[in-house]
Amino acid sequence: TSVLAEINKASFLSDTKKEKYEAEVRCARGLICYYLYDMFGPIVVATEEELDNPTQEKPLARLSKEEMVKYIETDLTYAAAHLPSPSEAEYGRFSKGLAKMLLIRLYLHETVSDKSYYDKVETLANDLMSSSMGYSLSDSYPKMFEVGGQGPDNKEIIWALPVNTEMVSWNDWHMFVLPTDFDDHGMPSGYESLNSTWYFYDSFEDGDTRRTYLVDSYKSKNGTIVNRENPGTHMELGPIPM
């Protein structure tokens, strides 16, 4: 909110630049507010005037559910109207596609209490899948999770988070999903914190490439094979989402 005020005050910015930056900020605010709303319910939203007086104590009430949804919807609708199209947006930056995807998530969230939101979901989803948006399914589902499978050429990705592969880093995901007794593929064991489900695994037919990175068996440190028939403590819940 404060950033939006500063953008409007910036006399050195053209109206076109102001519109672009406002759309990016409102998309970011819509994204963050949706996450907070999803986890905690309606939140407190301070006005620009209240933010300009941080030392003045003033109890603020949470927004109502309807006000919260409208607040997020307004930001994302503005962003969808003013952000560049996916083909014109710089890789990794916000685009119309992301704003519309977030609106779909918001509307799906609300279908629990109001089924009419499905109509909005359908309209936006059809728009997102239209040829004018430039998205398409990847020829290889597993490749999207492999080195080289991402990047601007992958038209299935709606919003990418670019990383510098030259920097020193490590794979946190494997540490969260690998079992504590994992001893396979030359990889270390992990924290055993996350699983997929057998229900999801069984939704794909045998030979479906979407099972490729759902590991349904592994060799433990004591040499036994852990799988659905011999689940131990980890595979009872489902396969490992590698």
Give the ranges of each region predicted by the language model.
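Short coil/linker segments at helix-helix boundaries
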Residues: 14, 42-66, 114-119
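Short coil/turn linking the two alpha-helices of tandem helical-hairpin repeats
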Residues: 37-44, 87, 106-115
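Structural recognition of the beta-strand scaffold that forms the well-ordered cores
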Residues: 4, 36, 44-46, 157-161
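TPR/Sel1-like alpha-solenoid repeat signature
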Residues: 26, 100-103
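Conserved, well-structured interaction surfaces
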Residues: 1-40, 60-68, 76-89, 242
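Elongated scaffold/linker segments in the mid-to-C-terminal portions of large proteins
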Residues: 123, 127-130, 134-242
